[in-house]
Swiss-Prot record:
Major localisation: membrane
Protein name per UniProt: Cytochrome b561 and DOMON domain-containing protein At2g04850
Binding site residues for heme b 2: H255, H324
Source organism: Arabidopsis thaliana (Mouse-ear cress)
UniProt entry keywords in alphabetical sequence: Electron transport, Heme, Iron, Membrane, Metal-binding, Signal, Transmembrane, Transmembrane helix, Transport
Record's signal peptide: 1-22
Length: 404
């Protein structure tokens, strides 16, 4: 039952649609209205536009958010290659270091920018198709730049004849040094901020990495159930059910079934993690990855150890039990810690999914405490009974000795 509850609560996370579907877009701003809009797959961004086919001109507005009061938000197009930052011509909005007012400057992202050979300097765009641009904060003149503040970047783009597709990029950063925006964060989401859309149909072709969100959620749900709940539950059954003489050796089969199910599900989750790492070159979550490898290795050793389990009469049995307990508990601790690391990687540190997992884990811990207290009560009661029996036998022996 607890596993079903955990699965349901974690599926609250799994049912969260990607931002491209869950986000909202608008065709109306304070100064202008547009015909079409789409939500972009990352950073809760969106874009609205009106296409004028008679002169192949595109009027658009990009909606983004600041992640720092001293940060920047940018949008641009790549006239040559889709899914590429290098070669893009971008417009970046940030607070003027002198006046603090929002300004919008043009930049060309050549290969030196990616290599970070020097600061990014503003220069006129060598793209005659970008005819006008401006930026404003949501809220008008009284609005201030702050963490989470919305910005609107307006632009007019002249498209080539017979071409209604536009390759565009967008991103945001934490700091601006003078008039030089610094590098944006390098999470998988930030590295996936590009797509191609058709201005006539509104159909967007997003990058392949945008689908990784669903894969990450699947990875998280499977691992939370396996490493984060089933393995601890299996350890609990081994510790407390075997003390119940009424069920005999049944406790062992229950323990083995739970642990084997957890390991098989964990193997699936671990494999998904490998796929995610392969699909995200340059993105590494060091601690999460190291804990995952260590947990899977420990679980594999536990499974293999069953093949070499000595009989109860074997003199090496006690050494095997010590090894089995140590590796097992280490695997459980690392697995639970890594589940919480996974919530941070998914940026779900304050989500209902994490709350649900914490409730299920707390319930399991509560059961452990109750069973542990019960075990000590039973142990103390038996010890007292044994002592009374010994004292009684001693008294009888003394009486027998005195009469003789």
């Amino acid at each position: 039952m607890a596993t079903l509850i955990l699965s349901f609560l974690l599926l609250l996370l799994a049912t969260k649609l990607p931002e491209s579907l869950a986000g909202h877009c608008t065709t109306t701003t304070a100064t202008k209205s547009f015909e079409k809009c789409i939500s972009l797959p990352t950073q809760q961004a969106s874009i609205a536009w009106t296409y004028h086919p008679h002169n192949a001109t595109l009027d658009l507005c990009f909606f983004g958010t600041f992640i720092s009061p001293s940060g920047w938000v940018g949008w641009g197009i790549n006239p040559d290659s889709p899914a590429q930052m290098t070669g893009s011509r971008v417009l970046i909005a940030f607070p003027d270091p002198n006046s603090g007012q929002l300004i919008l400057l043009p930049y060309v992202l050549d290969s030196s920018v990616k290599l970070q050979k020097g600061p990014l300097l503003s220069r006129p765009l060598d793209l005659v198709r970008l005819s006008s641009s401006s930026a404003s904060l949501y809220g008008g003149k009284m609005a201030t730049i702050r963490n989470g503040a919305s910005v609107q970047i307006y632009a007019s783009v002249k498209l080539s004849s017979n071409n209604t597709k536009i390759h565009h990029v967008w991103n945001r950063g934490l700091y601006v040094q003078g008039y030089s925006p610094t590098i944006h964060p390098t999470t998988s989401t930030d590295l996936s901020s590009f797509s191609t859309f058709d201005v006539t149909s509104g159909f967007a072709t997003v990058n392949q990495n945008s689908g990784s969100r669903a894969l990450k959620v699947t990875h998280g749900v499977v691992n939370a159930i396996s490493w984060g709940f089933l393995l601890p539950a299996g350890a609990v059954t081994a510790r407390y059910l075997r003390q119940m003489q009424s069920i005999g050796p049944t406790w062992f089969y229950i323990h083995a079934a739970i642990q084997l199910t957890g390991f098989l599900l964990g193997t699936i989750g671990f494999s998904i993690g490998i796929v995610l790492g392969h699909n995200s070159p340059g993105v590494t979550y060091g601690l999460h990855r190291s804990l995952g490898i260590a947990t899977f290795t420990a679980a594999a050793l536990q499974t293999l150890a069953l093949l070499f389990r000595p009989k109860t009469t074997n003199k090496f049995r006690r050494y095997w039990k010590s090894y089995h307990h140590f590796v097992g508990y280490a695997c459980v601790v690392m697995g639970v810690v890594n589940v919480f690391q996974g919530f941070e990687v998914l940026r779900e540190g304050r989500s209902y999914a994490k709350l649900g997992y914490c409730l299920c884990l707390s319930t399991l811990v509560g059961v452990c405490v109750a069973m542990e207290v019960n075990s000590w009560v039973v142990f103390c009661r038996k010890a007292k009974e044994e002592k009374m029996k010994r004292d009684g036998l001693t008294g009888v022996d003394r009486c027998s000795g005195s009469h003789s």
